[in-house]
């Protein structure tokens, strides 16, 4: 049997981290078992579903690299199929028309609540013959009244629910539109889904959906209900904890590999291993290893993983993601070093690509003024002679490379009988405008000869003015 899983978000908002983790687990289970992964958009909530939210979900999935083998399917394009099955169930007697008014249902619930009884439909229309009338009606599934629903959940183990606790679920509204729980069942059946991976908030739907599947003589898939994600303070995850759309993490400078690695460990483990490549995830992932307990979101851990991947992934690959941030920050990279070289130079010093982009601006643009603290410390009168000699030696270089630049700095220090720092730091501030950068010879190389000479001249003028003031 081919394993077939699905991710079925509702396009009523962004793809958040909880949904992304569910998608990842479902995708991994399919990939780990040479199976297929289906993307389905559950857009039956016509009032809340939006094209913008749908586009955001697809963009998030693509950015994460969670490719799908089928879809995206849209439930709103399958209404004819749902109505076909509803008609079939009415014909077979596994569903019925309910003419109870909203007022009657509300009164019934109030009475049940007053008696301390479970609030559920009392079956008033269950065994009545259909009426030849124009009265509005809903269609209800005729849930079994005896026995239990039993299923083995990959995460939670065996679950058993008495049918006495389940009421007759509405499967079509008064306007004829099918309901969520019914559409899901028909979709999973038609699409051949063998395992449903979803959040634990759906676990109460499962017995109802299983009963509908059995009434249709359809195969019942396996289930894995994943625990929720909490904030690091134990409260329900909210925006202040990091419950934002997946693309916000892109905007904030995270690599997809870092977010995927973080999400896979948010409830699943393989020994003590923390860092997983995508291939390792596919190799080791098992649904039965998912933790039952809720997991706490920890932004510091995500940052640590992002730093790891910024340093460990190929600079050329990281550069492709960095390019988006350069454009976002209006940094024109046409005249300057290759982005892969910038990644190699700066990745050790940045937590995010957003940070890396901001710190690389001096490679491509001239700065208006020197950092006040750095200039006060390193562009003093004693820096004038080293800068002037460096300017002369740089002008004489026939080749502009790291080794030649380093030799020029060493020669300047030796000639003036100064420590390397007394030469290197004024040079660093001169060419970057600040007191922090990668190795100064590498920095000067990446800035380029023409820009270096121009900026050293600017620094010399700055120091001279300072002496004369």
Swiss-Prot record:
PROSITE patterns: AA_TRNA_LIGASE_I
Protein EC: 6.1.1.17
Entry's Gene Ontology cellular component terms: cytosol
A Pfam family it matches: Anticodon_2
Binding locations of Zn(2+): 98, 100, 125, 127
Reaction catalysis annotation: tRNA(Glu) + L-glutamate + ATP = L-glutamyl-tRNA(Glu) + AMP + diphosphate
Residue window of motif 'HIGH' region: 9-19
InterPro entries (alphabetical): aa-tRNA-synth_I_cd-bd, aa-tRNA-synth_I_codon-bd_sub2, aa-tRNA-synth_I_CS, aa_tRNA-synth_I_cd-bd_sf, Glu-tRNA-ligase_bac/mito, Glu/Gln-tRNA-synth, Glu/Gln-tRNA-synth_Ib_cat-dom, GluQ/Sye
Gene3D superfamilies assigned: 1.10.10.350, HUPs
Chain segments annotated as transmembrane: none
Binding-site list for ATP: 239
Family to which this protein belongs: Belongs to the class-I aminoacyl-tRNA synthetase family. Glutamate--tRNA ligase type 1 subfamily.
Protein known as: Glutamate--tRNA ligase
Organism: Shewanella loihica (strain ATCC BAA-1088 / PV-4)
Upper taxonomic lineage: Bacteria, Pseudomonadati, Pseudomonadota, Gammaproteobacteria, Alteromonadales
């Amino acid at each position: 049997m081919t394993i077939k899983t699905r991710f079925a978000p509702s396009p009523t908002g962004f793809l958040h981290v909880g949904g992304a983790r569910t998608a990842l687990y479902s995708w991994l289970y399919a990939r780990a078992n040479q199976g297929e992964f289906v993307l389905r958009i559950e857009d039956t909530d016509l009032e809340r579903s939006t094209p913008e939210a749908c586009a955001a979900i697809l963009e998030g999935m693509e950015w994460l690299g969670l490719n799908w083998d089928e879809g995206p399917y849209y439930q709103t394009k399958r209404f004819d199929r749902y109505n076909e099955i509803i008609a079939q169930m009415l014909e077979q007697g596994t569903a019925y028309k309910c003419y109870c008014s909203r007022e009657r249902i509300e009164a019934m619930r109030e009475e049940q609540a007053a008696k301390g009884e479970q609030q559920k439909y009392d079956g008033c229309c269950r065994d009545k013959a259909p009426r030849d009338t124009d009265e509005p009606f809903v269609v209800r599934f005729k849930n079994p009244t005896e026995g239990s629903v039993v299923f083995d959940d990959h995460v939670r183990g065996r679950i058993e629910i008495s049918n006495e606790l389940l009421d007759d679920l509405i499967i079509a509204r008064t306007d004829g539109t099918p309901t969520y729980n019914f559409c899901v069942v028909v979709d999973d059946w038609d699409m051949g889904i063998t395992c449903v991976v979803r959040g634990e908030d759906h676990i109460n739907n499962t017995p109802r959906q299983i009963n509908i599947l059995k009434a249709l003589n359809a195969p019942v898939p396996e289930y894995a209900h994943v625990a929720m994600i909490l904030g690091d303070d134990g409260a329900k995850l909210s925006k202040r904890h990091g419950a934002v759309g997946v693309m916000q993490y892109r905007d904030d400078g995270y690599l997809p590999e870092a977010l995927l690695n973080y999400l896979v460990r948010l409830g699943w483990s393989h020994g003590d291993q923390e860092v997983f490549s995508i291939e390792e995830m596919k190799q080791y992932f098992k649904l039965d290893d998912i933790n039952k307990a809720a997991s706490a979101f920890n932004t510091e851990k995500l940052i640590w993983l992002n730093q790891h991947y910024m340093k460990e992934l190929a600079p050329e690959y990281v550069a492709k993601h960095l390019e988006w941030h350069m454009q976002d920050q209006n940094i024109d990279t046409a005249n300057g070093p290759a982005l892969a070289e910038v990644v190699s130079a700066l990745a050790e010093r940045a937590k995010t690509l957003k940070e890396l982009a901001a710190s690389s601006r001096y490679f491509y643009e001239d700065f208006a003024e020197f950092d006040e603290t750095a200039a006060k410390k390193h562009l003093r009168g004693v820096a004038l002679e080293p800068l002037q000699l460096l300017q002369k030696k740089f002008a004489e270089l026939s080749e502009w490379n790291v080794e030649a630049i380093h030799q020029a700095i060493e020669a300047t220090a030796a000639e003036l009988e100064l420590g390397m720092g007394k030469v290197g730091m004024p040079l660093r501030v001169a060419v970057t405008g600040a007191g922090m950068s990668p190795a100064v010879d590498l920095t000067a190389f990446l800035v380029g000869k023409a820009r270096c000479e121009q900026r050293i001249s600017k620094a010399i003028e700055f120091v001279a003015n300072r002496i004369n003031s």
